[in-house]
């Protein structure tokens, strides 16, 4: 007989549903990814709480509801190719990996990129490629993407990043000042042109250009 999930994980799952996450594929992906593996050992007792937690290099792992909400807004299909800007702990990429064909995730901190890669490999997320790179300067050879997810706040989404969307592609990003509340924005490369919709208020660490010289 399989063991029942711990009470804190059951509450975690229930809270996502109560807060409006209804896409069953997204809920299954969130259930399948062990968030406690993506936080530091001293914070594992907090892993199933719906709150952001600190990780290395002054970054954070987003609260689960925000991860689920952004994932749901991407409207992912199994054949999609996804670009993630800001790997962080690798938690968001692990969720995405269960919903699409391929994930390319860029991280400017080598420490984070290396540790995320190791976690994702341990979970056999073989369709995720972690690269040390600059999210403001995506390599041309990467091509176009069906979906792009930015996990740090941009003051504005660069046109060069929007240009990486394939036709009918969707980009989700927090947009706004770095030291204030931002707005989660959905941008679609529709047949008639670029469509933009503001979704909800969020708070993210800033997206910075370049690759970190240290860490």
UniProtKB/Swiss-Prot annotation:
Localization per Swiss-Prot or TrEMBL: Cytoplasm
State the taxonomy lineage.
Bacteria, Pseudomonadati, Pseudomonadota, Alphaproteobacteria, Hyphomicrobiales
Q: Which reaction does it catalyse?
A: [protein]-L-isoaspartate + S-adenosyl-L-methionine = [protein]-L-isoaspartate alpha-methyl ester + S-adenosyl-L-homocysteine
Query: What does the UniProt keyword field contain?
Result: Cytoplasm, Methyltransferase, S-adenosyl-L-methionine, Transferase
Q: Which residues form the active site?
A: 62
**EC identifiers of the protein:** 2.1.1.77
A Gene Ontology biological process noted in the UniProt record is: protein modification process
Tell me the enzyme class: transferase
PANTHER family linked to this entry: PROTEIN-L-ISOASPARTATE O-METHYLTRANSFERASE (PTHR11579), PROTEIN-L-ISOASPARTATE(D-ASPARTATE) O-METHYLTRANSFERASE (PTHR11579:SF0)
UniProt keyword Cytoplasm present: yes
CDD domains linked: AdoMet_MTases (cd02440)
Q: Which organism is it from?
A: Rhodopseudomonas palustris (strain BisA53)
The keyword Methyltransferase belongs to this UniProt entry's keyword annotation: yes
In Gene Ontology terms, what is one molecular function of this protein? protein-L-isoaspartate (D-aspartate) O-methyltransferase activity
Record GO cellular component, one term: cytoplasm
Please give the name of this protein. Answer: Protein-L-isoaspartate O-methyltransferase
Known InterPro entries for this protein?
Answer: PCMT (IPR000682), SAM-dependent_MTases_sf (IPR029063)
Main location (coarse class): cytoplasm
